[in-house]
């Protein structure tokens, strides 16, 4: 068993060897909480949830840090529009993140640092860069000198010469280079007091890029095993993180960089200007979060993902069928604390785990889950209890532990619905088809359940997703 990761830095698939045995440090760039969480965010955090789940499944200990950029120009602007304190606005959308992430069944990080909680650490980081001659001050603003870091552009495969040739902007504000970026921003007129902190260079607040470097080094050390986010962060954000971190420490900042592909909506880029920008809250009014999570797993994380009505409906129907198969299985056998001894199931388990070992290929892993579903359907007709117990264990391992899409137990139907189901089954036995159809319509249309009829005459109810 060796996990392989496509490393953005080398643009190659590399074998995964963390720095310290089975301990893995992982830093994922979090949201800027000025608006509701959207579909693009969902893909990032589901992708890294699969990474974390598989690392845990393979026996690693994972220290996962995910930040909140809770001070930012967008937060200040939006809070002023809403006549709120920036901290109040940020807290609203931080809470929204946790609600929507919970609905997507995303495992929690070990820590969620906020920028406003780590200003002293950020200031100290900047001071070291200034003291080493890697950053300079202009009127209370501090800039990182990109020219001082010879490897600038190695993540995004750019170089300063090409950047200069393609640049449309000249040097402004007295900067040494147009590509030097802000580490500390002097307080502007009319900015709220609560986004202003004292520093050796006067009152101000951190720039965006320095925040992640300072927080990650404080909580995970100078070198991180895994770092990543969406592809849009490769340049300039992650490029600048590398520059300031490696310039400060002289050490490799990140061993393995992981970036997920963009989300499009019906083949168009998701954006507010095109009116195809969907918050998770709005999507979840129409689609079950489990369906959305399943759909996000149907493509390899590095590929673009098109979110379409046809695609999500297909995912809904597929997941509904899986739920029905699983409910039939758990109605036939309760035990799952068994060893996988049947060779075909052991081989299938190996194939499933190997798919995730190979750069966390959820698309391929799902194909083995579907293969398992077929074996369960066949087993329900012919298999004994031991075989069914193994099938149940494997399904819960694949769909639950690894992929996070297993039907929750609380979705079982309540007593009133079971009574309606009994009425329908009695009507069917008596060949009272009109009454059977009436109750069926009541269960499906008014109570939101699907009915799965078994060959032995019994039926199961599954909450529609």
Swiss-Prot record:
Pfam name, any one: tRNA-synt_1e
GO molecular function, one term: cysteine-tRNA ligase activity
Entry annotated with the keyword Plastid: no
Positions of Zn(2+) binding: 29, 212, 237, 241
EC number(s) per entry: 6.1.1.16
Family matches, as NCBIfam families: cysS
This protein's name: Cysteine--tRNA ligase
Residue spans crossing the bilayer: none
Cofactor: Zn(2+)
UniProt source species: Endomicrobium trichonymphae
Motif ('HIGH' region): 31-41
Catalysed reactions, as listed in the record: tRNA(Cys) + L-cysteine + ATP = L-cysteinyl-tRNA(Cys) + AMP + diphosphate
Positions bound to ATP: 272
UniProt record similarity statement: Belongs to the class-I aminoacyl-tRNA synthetase family.
Top EC class for this record: ligase
Protein biosynthesis in keyword set: yes
Top-level taxon in the UniProt lineage: Bacteria
GO cellular component, one term: cytoplasm
SMART domains reported for this sequence: DALR_2
Location(s) in or outside the cell: Cytoplasm
Keywords, comma-separated and alphabetical: Aminoacyl-tRNA synthetase, ATP-binding, Cytoplasm, Ligase, Metal-binding, Nucleotide-binding, Protein biosynthesis, Zinc
Motif ('KMSKS' region): 269-273
GO terms for biological process, alphabetical: cysteinyl-tRNA aminoacylation
Cofactor note: Binds 1 zinc ion per subunit.
HAMAP family: Cys_tRNA_synth
Primary residence: cytoplasm
